[in-house]
Amino acid sequence: MDDDKGTDTTDAKEGCSGWFMLEAACSDDSDLDNSLEKLFEDGTESDVSDLINDDDTAAQGNSRELLCQQQSEECEQQIQYLKRKYFSPKAVQQLSPRLQSMNISPGHKSKRRLFVEHDSGLECSLNEAEDLTEEVEVPASAPAPAAQGGVGSGHYTSLLRCNNVKAVLLGKFKDAFGVSYNELTRQFRSNKTCCKHWVLAIYAAKDELIDASKQLLQQHCTYLWLQTFSPMSLYLCCFNVGKSRETVMRLLSSMLQVNENHILSEPPKIRSMIAALFWYKGSMNPNVYAFGEYPEWIMTQTMIHHQTADSVQFDLSEMIQWAYDQDYVDECTIAYQYARLADSNSNARAFLAHNSQAKYVRECAQMVRYYKRGEMRDMSISAWIHHCISKIEGDGHWQDIVKFLRYQGLNFIVFLDKFRTFLKNFPKKNCLLICGPPDTGKSMFSMSLMKALRGQVVSFANSKSHFWLQPLADAKLALLDDATEVCWQYIDAFLRNGLDGNMVSLDMKHRAPCQMKFPPLIITSNISLKKEKKFPYLHSRIYEFEFPNKFPFDANDTPLFKLTDQSWASFFKRLWTQLELSDQEEEGENGETQRTFQCTTREVNGLI
């Protein structure tokens, strides 16, 4: 073992240790280039191959960098998702509003790219410059001044500047109150339709004006319901009188200083139990302001006694009694008028809820006709005349009829005598003929009498039918208007038996022929039987009155003789004794029966 510890540096130059000189001398090959080539050729098999660590175990710093990169990518994806959800797309830069409105072909606004694509830098698309579109943010407009109706914040006003303002308001209403506006209201298409009850949804009204409206609306409303969930306010206004949508919108827009476009106004659903419960239970909320008594339609849908009344089954006899009392015999009139009673009549509500309404209407009308026909047949002619004129309202003068008969040159005493036997329906005295030139008032005189005494009219135009004389079976008095020569031939051939006052067989539709006597019959015609020798057998059966003079009118085309229901009522009252009509005290007190007809088990003075 050498005793020297290290390299001898005594012969080294200044500044150098001389170590490299010794090591260079120990090398087998002094050529530096050959040494480097040999080093690279040997690779890992060389003596210095252990200097490079080839283990698969990664350093701790590389794993942390990978985790950081993954977290960054996940965070970027979440940010892009939030941008898609909450950010509104940018509008395309607009050069001019007028220029944008003059597009020849429909343009499509570019959508904002939410996910950014990173360019590798290796290739560039040739159309990359064409796809670039400059995007700008559309600045929000300043809020409109209060004088123009815009009192909401600028944010609210900008939200409402869209194509469908109503859809935005409906959405905000549902978000605020948790119920759809259309579930509480029914639609009025016309702004002129009047209604007492209105549901109003108002957007972005000032709180101080809403508080003031609570007092201002009390003078207009019988009931007021108000609840506010900013920025929406909900009103239920039951006005003293009916108002149209235009009137209500003007009232609320001026009172709350809001634009009419920010108001939804429709009438409430008055037959919906769910809607009524919304208002009823809402009024118990301390945040709801309520003034006045509940409207009738809320009470009807929510109170217990009304609900028990609705459960009552439909009673047809009650409907028939109502139609009989109202003197309704037509199906359409019965159906319409009875449906209008649904708000106040439990049986009418049960009728509307039934699936066989048409069947019940037909049966009701048929039964009323049966009762009316039986009532008429049970009355004498005196009782029938008294029954008819007692229902005529208003005052008239009997002298209008007398003056008209004298104007036509008739002897009133003779007319009164023939009219008396006519009403008595004596054989061969039960038919009167009123003839004369046109426009002499024949039909007007006869029709006014038929209307006052509720007579029936038959027309020879229907003579081809076997049932054209069927209305005579339901009449106390009848009229055959404007008989022509063909009609007289038919009467002479087939109706002489009926004019004699004998029983005849009358064809009835869907029924067997009816055995009956003709009621008193008035015939109007332009043909005088006295001058016609072709009908000698009718001369003794028909008494003729001639109207030779044209009916007079004044300068305003108003008839000079008032032949009205009131005139005929006065005529019969004045000449009741001369016509030998029976005293009504013998048939009943004041010409009426002691008790009205009853076809249902209804209560009378608390008794059934």
UniProtKB/Swiss-Prot annotation:
<dbReference type="GO" id="GO:0016887">
    <property type="term" value="F:ATP hydrolysis activity"/>
</dbReference>
<dbReference type="InterPro" id="IPR037102">
    <property type="entry name" value="Znf_lg_T-Ag_D1_dom_sf"/>
</dbReference>
<keyword id="KW-1017">Isopeptide bond</keyword>
<dbReference type="Pfam" id="PF20450">
    <property type="entry name" value="PPV_E1_DBD"/>
</dbReference>
<keyword id="KW-0378">Hydrolase</keyword>
<feature type="modified residue" description="Phosphoserine; by host">
    <location>
        <position position="88"/>
    </location>
</feature>
<feature type="short sequence motif" description="Nuclear localization signal">
    <location>
        <begin position="83"/>
        <end position="85"/>
    </location>
</feature>
<keyword id="KW-0244">Early protein</keyword>
<dbReference type="GO" id="GO:0006260">
    <property type="term" value="P:DNA replication"/>
</dbReference>
<dbReference type="GO" id="GO:0005524">
    <property type="term" value="F:ATP binding"/>
</dbReference>
<dbReference type="InterPro" id="IPR014000">
    <property type="entry name" value="PPV_DNA_helicase_E1_N"/>
</dbReference>
<dbReference type="InterPro" id="IPR001177">
    <property type="entry name" value="PPV_DNA_helicase_E1_C"/>
</dbReference>
<dbReference type="GO" id="GO:0003677">
    <property type="term" value="F:DNA binding"/>
</dbReference>
<keyword id="KW-0597">Phosphoprotein</keyword>
<keyword id="KW-0547">Nucleotide-binding</keyword>
<dbReference type="InterPro" id="IPR046935">
    <property type="entry name" value="PPV_E1_DBD_sf"/>
</dbReference>
<feature type="cross-link" description="Glycyl lysine isopeptide (Lys-Gly) (interchain with G-Cter in SUMO)">
    <location>
        <position position="517"/>
    </location>
</feature>
<feature type="modified residue" description="Phosphoserine; by host">
    <location>
        <position position="96"/>
    </location>
</feature>
<dbReference type="GO" id="GO:0003678">
    <property type="term" value="F:DNA helicase activity"/>
</dbReference>
<comment type="similarity">
    <text>Belongs to the papillomaviridae E1 protein family.</text>
</comment>
<keyword id="KW-0832">Ubl conjugation</keyword>
<keyword id="KW-0235">DNA replication</keyword>
<keyword id="KW-1048">Host nucleus</keyword>
<dbReference type="InterPro" id="IPR027417">
    <property type="entry name" value="P-loop_NTPase"/>
</dbReference>
<dbReference type="InterPro" id="IPR046832">
    <property type="entry name" value="PPV_E1_DBD"/>
</dbReference>
<protein>
    <recommendedName>
        <fullName>Replication protein E1</fullName>
        <ecNumber>5.6.2.4</ecNumber>
    </recommendedName>
</protein>
<feature type="region of interest" description="DNA-binding region">
    <location>
        <begin position="148"/>
        <end position="311"/>
    </location>
</feature>
<comment type="subunit">
    <text>Can form hexamers. Interacts with E2 protein; this interaction increases E1 DNA binding specificity. Interacts with host DNA polymerase subunit POLA2. Interacts with host single stranded DNA-binding protein RPA1. Interacts with host TOP1; this interaction stimulates the enzymatic activity of TOP1.</text>
</comment>
<dbReference type="Pfam" id="PF00524">
    <property type="entry name" value="PPV_E1_N"/>
</dbReference>
<keyword id="KW-0238">DNA-binding</keyword>
<keyword id="KW-0347">Helicase</keyword>
<comment type="function">
    <text>ATP-dependent DNA 3'-5' helicase required for initiation of viral DNA replication. It forms a complex with the viral E2 protein. The E1-E2 complex binds to the replication origin which contains binding sites for both proteins. During the initial step, a dimer of E1 interacts with a dimer of protein E2 leading to a complex that binds the viral origin of replication with high specificity. Then, a second dimer of E1 displaces the E2 dimer in an ATP-dependent manner to form the E1 tetramer.</text>
</comment>
<dbReference type="InterPro" id="IPR014015">
    <property type="entry name" value="Helicase_SF3_DNA-vir"/>
</dbReference>
<dbReference type="GO" id="GO:0042025">
    <property type="term" value="C:host cell nucleus"/>
</dbReference>
<keyword id="KW-0067">ATP-binding</keyword>
<dbReference type="Pfam" id="PF00519">
    <property type="entry name" value="PPV_E1_C"/>
</dbReference>
<dbReference type="InterPro" id="IPR016393">
    <property type="entry name" value="Rep_E1_papillomaV"/>
</dbReference>
<feature type="domain" description="SF3 helicase">
    <location>
        <begin position="410"/>
        <end position="560"/>
    </location>
</feature>
<keyword id="KW-0413">Isomerase</keyword>
<feature type="binding site">
    <location>
        <begin position="436"/>
        <end position="443"/>
    </location>
    <ligand>
        <name>ATP</name>
    </ligand>
</feature>
